[in-house]
């Protein structure tokens, strides 16, 4: 006997492939097994038993009828028996070899080919059916995609995250504030708009949390591991979807093999119905063997004809059923849009409205999965949802950033508030909202932030920074922050990315915006209305605006500080500045200004002006600053100013003057008449000498002359007895006057980078000057007398 297992190699498949076999493929598989058993059984009988047995006919050649075996038919037998004739056996005078010869000869010549080869044909046709059915599981171009899909599908189905994601979505309206522990929820009712969970899903959702809660110590560790595995699954699903949706080779291959099976079914059915009647029990055989055996006609018995005829009809029945399944498969393939798959029902059941529809081979495989068990596609859809992925990221974040770890990052910022700074995270940990002591929250390069209701736990929050971090704020959270938030800093590539809710924070005192206007909007520089910001005192805008935004005038009645940083783009229209009647501080940095704007001189309340990084060459307009009677700080640094006009003396209320990083070579003597000056910064210029009139600045406390070309200092400079800081580094000084002893308040003296050979020992008389405040080469310091050094090193 030939065991059926020998043919296993033709149809051997991975057990996991069963999920891609709809009911008709399973039925066809069982039918092929039955047909194969028929064929193998017939072949076994054919090989192990006699095929045909022949006896010679004794009638003379002239009397031979058309059918040598006619006398053996039932009618002939009954007639002979009716005569009640006594019969005796006939001697044929043939030996065994002659019988064997006649049997073989008649088998080959007289027996119809269908009767001879029927079992072999059954085996061959069945094997072809098997190959057609499993070909796409073996062909490299399709099997690789199928194996990859089955692998991912099994992991997605078994992943605990699938159940938890469905649970989270279904019960989100009933869940309390999120914590850093496992996000496990028992679904009892369905929230509005979140859909219903299927019965099978609901059972799993309820069972899983019970199992988790029973072992709390293990859950956290396992949840973290499961979260990492689910995160990897999301990436695999994304890449697999992109790869499989590109083509339809699986769909085409399945159609081709089905069409081939249908064609073969019709061919088998036709020729079997035609030739099945050729299987007969008695076979007439006429062969010219009279010279060898003495007989020319024989009557043969096909010993397996009766069994083969029954097997043939049984085989035809199986083939018919098999053909019907193939025809139904073709109907299913062409009647339905199998290259598109919609998750609409899954979206309705789970509430995950962002699950995308898929196409091509991806859609076709999901249709096949639905024929096996639609639960697979429902659970697989979880890993196509961005909502689910974001929740998973949130869970992983909560595990990674515990409240204890976040508290380690707390520190005081420049405004003195307790700040938590988070940078380049995949999301915002829910554990942040457990730190009620946080006063300032800085979020940088965090994608798609959505503030949860837990934001209301940050009762001390007064400052928020969003740097390249888009944020959505629910209405309830807007109400919470509207009167509570005092400072907000927002930075994006373009200003139109700034969230609109920012301009509705009516309790805001400081607004800092950074981003570019699109090229077509830069000249107009349109900004959202600021009318809601009734308490705004500070407005900072870093962009490429062509003019001062008109909406700045919305806060003209209470704005005290305005900063415009234009990154070198020329600011043309500044007339809006005239309306800022209470403005105290104005910064126009890198605005491409070549002259001091006249609109500034209308700001009667102005106290500080900063014109850094512009293209100022002449400051003749400085005379008009006498209208700004409250101006105490003027920063004209980092420009191209070549001289200071004489009427600088009109600025008698000026206390701080910054002229560093310009092209000054001389100073007017009238500068000494600015008697209110306490700080004068002239570093990084080309000054070769100083006017003696600087000694008239009796209020001067800070004088910076570093990085110039000074060769000597006027003795009158040491009349500035209140001078605390004197920076003379990197000049051409060859000596320091002993009159430096008159500077009793001096606490910081820089002399590095000069041509000094010795230091005057009178430095020891500067009571406030210590070693830490003296910046000079070590060799020069060591040249001071020991008692001077000891005095300077005293605490």
From Swiss-Prot:
Q: What is its main location?
A: membrane
Q: Summarize the record's disruption phenotype note.
A: No visible phenotype in normal conditions. Impaired response to herpes simplex virus 1 (HSV-1) infection, caused by decreased ability to transport 2'-3'-cGAMP.
The record's keywords, sorted A to Z, are: Cell membrane, Disulfide bond, Endoplasmic reticulum, Glycoprotein, Ion channel, Ion transport, Leucine-rich repeat, Lysosome, Membrane, Repeat, Transmembrane, Transmembrane helix, Transport
A Pfam family this protein belongs to? Answer: Pannexin_like
Please list the coiled coil stretches.
none
Q: Which family does it belong to?
A: Belongs to the LRRC8 family.
Quaternary organization = Heterohexamer; oligomerizes with other LRRC8 proteins (LRRC8A, LRRC8C, LRRC8D and/or LRRC8B) to form a heterohexamer. In vivo, the subunit composition may depend primarily on expression levels, and heterooligomeric channels containing various proportions of the different LRRC8 proteins may coexist.
Per the entry, what this protein does is: Non-essential component of the volume-regulated anion channel (VRAC, also named VSOAC channel), an anion channel required to maintain a constant cell volume in response to extracellular or intracellular osmotic changes. The VRAC channel conducts iodide better than chloride and can also conduct organic osmolytes like taurine. Mediates efflux of amino acids, such as aspartate, in response to osmotic stress. The VRAC channel also mediates transport of immunoreactive cyclic dinucleotide GMP-AMP (2'-3'-cGAMP), an immune messenger produced in response to DNA virus in the cytosol.
Name of the featured protein: Volume-regulated anion channel subunit LRRC8E
Q: What is the organism of origin for this protein?
A: Mus musculus (Mouse)
Organism classification: Eukaryota, Metazoa, Chordata, Craniata, Vertebrata
Write the gene name. Answer: Lrrc8e
